[in-house]
Amino acid sequence: MTQAQGSFTVQAWDESTYEDLAGEAKLTRAHVTFGYAGDLQGQGISDSLMCYRDNGTAVYTGLERITGQLAGRSGSFVLLSTGAYADGEAKTSWQVVEGSGTGDLAGLRGQGSSVAASGPGGTFTFEYDLC
């Protein structure tokens, strides 16, 4: 597998509560736009479901379509992600949805992770194969 690394920034974040739970806990939906730089360059559009807990932590899952270039190859692909927020840091794991690659990225397979401290972005690592 080939490894890619880089950074991402949050370009837009639209989040709304759809269910209030006991105390400060709640369920929300977020529509987020990301910008990517490094071995992966482009833009991602994500929709996620989140569960915030009373203790200030959260868990989330979502889908993100990324359009851009990976190692100089152009196209798009979809990621399925899960993650958790605790101690001021969001840690996310994701995998490429099989069959979602387009253009030069058709046949893309792989998985990765990202870390973001409270702020506008973070870093990612991505291990992939192009079949």
Located regions from the model:
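Targeting-peptide/extracellular-domain and disordered-appendage signature
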Residues: 1-131
